[in-house]
C-alpha cells in the first residue's frame, strides 16, 4: 500500500510540475525528487522479492535488506529535505538543529536495524533452489538492477 501511494505521489507531482508550474519537464533529477525515487526503486525490488520469498522461501535475507534499505532511504530523504544540507527548490527548511535530530534518528534506526539483521541472519539462510534460467533468476537480476539504480541515484544526489 505504501508503494502505491509513493507511486501516486511521484506521478501526481511530476504531472503537476509539468502542467501547472510550466517547468517544461516531468523530472529534473533534483535531490529531493531523487529522495522519493530511491525508496521507490528499492520498494519495487522488495515487492518482487517478497513474491519469491512467499512462494518459494528464497531471497529471505535479500528481502529483509531491501526493507531496511527502502525505509532507511525514506528517512534519508526526510533528512535531506528538512536539514538544509542540500540546495534544492524543494528544500523546506534550513534549520541545522532539526537536521541533527533527524540525522540521529537515521543513525539509530539504521544501526539498530542492521544490528538485528546481523544477529538473526543465520536463521534467514536457506530457501529454495532454482535453475540458472528461471523466473527467480530473472527477479534476482531485476532486483540487482533496481538496487544499482537506487545506489546510483544516491551517489548522484550526495555527490
Regions found by a protein language model. Give the residues of each.
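Specific lipid-exposed transmembrane alpha-helices and their immediate membrane-water interface residues
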Residues: 77-90, 109-124, 145-159
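Membrane-interface interhelical loops and short amphipathic "cap" helices
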Residues: 11-35, 56, 80-102, 127-133, ...
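Acidic/polar loop patches that form or flank catalytic/metal-binding clefts of enzymes
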Residues: 48-62, 86-88, 115-119, 123-128
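Aromatic-anchored segments of alpha-helical transmembrane domains
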Residues: 9-10, 69-78
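Hydrophobic cores of alpha-helical transmembrane segments in multi-pass inner/ER membrane proteins
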Residues: 35-50, 101-121, 146-151
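Membrane-interfacial loop-to-helix junctions in multi-pass inner-membrane proteins
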Residues: 1-3, 52-68, 96-100, 129-141
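A conserved hydrophobic secondary-structure block that centers on an alpha-helix together
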Residues: 1-14
